[in-house]
Amino acid sequence: MENISRRTFLKSGAAAAAAAAFPLSAEAAAPAGTAAVSALCPTQYGPVQGKAQGSHLVWYGIPYAAAPVGDARWRAPQEPTGWTNPLDCTAPAPAAYQVSSAPIGTEDCLRLDVYSVPSAHSRPVLVYLHGGNNQTGDSLELPGGDLVENDGCVFVSLNYRLGLFGFNSLPALCPEDGGTGNFALLDIAKALDWVRENISAFGGDPANITLSGFSAGGRNVMACLTSPLFAGRFQKAISFSGGITFSDPDAAARQIAAALAPLAVEDGRFADENAAFAGLLTPDAAVREWLCSVEPSRIASRMPHAALRMSVFPHLYADDVVLPKAGFAAGTLHQVPLLLLTGSTEFSAFALYDGWFASE
């Protein structure tokens, strides 16, 4: 799609997808006496205070899980601590920790944004996963105001762990008793649970959830379609510019160990990088303890800027825990309606720098 911005493409595609998936007639009539959705809204963990923007309401940065910090850095997301007083959700929350031109964001990132309108009742819910190679991006990539005002849905966009915080298959972080390095997918599953348990208070229908995403987010949607973990967690799917590429967790662990070995030597954990490489590939609890203590900027900077075929940053591990080793061939694809969207020239920039594609 030439001469069109990323956000324009997303907005146009999202509007078209919403029109197809959520006809305005899909919204059930509210029973007599039903209260309007308010900017002060209850959740199972405590009340959240949003704000009006034009004709819609928005709540930014609602916690759907506890902060994955310290020893929880590479663990499944846990329940957030509840609160009693209204939580201020009137300003955008920081992005998940990431490195672009400079480090930005926070590890306390397991938060989501909700957009709705006061009159919403049992509306279809569109959950959106942002793009960015699973290394960059945030929940603000696609604002949902136009969608909820014009297309009859409630819109949810979420942040989840990125880079080596979201995908890390080192043995010390993925014990053999069913552990997985697909932490970002665990975050997405947890966010979908939050939506199912809380979205009715925002005017959404918890039994009518569409999972959508753009680019890396679209690939995550396709991964969720194959994962037994996501059975029953959503009813429809939309992938914008997404594909399906899984990686070998063992090969990825070797690549991650090589990337992190210099840090282990710097911190005096091993005598040299060869010893560090070997040590990082063991399930030693001391490896986990050290990794959880390292400053996030040092970790995030070790594997920047993902490339085609995941050659720089392998992720979406086919570990037979969250994702089947056989991919689509495993026959575990969830039988839900799937809408695929793409741009006519979206791959051109990637092809310029990839040896598999010859220029004419």
Task: Please place each PLM-identified region on the residue numbering.
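Gly/Ala-rich beta-loop-alpha elbow adjacent to hydrolase catalytic centers
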Residues: G213, G217
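Alpha/beta-hydrolase fold nucleophile elbow
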Residues: G204-S212
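N-terminal export signals
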Residues: E2, T8-A29
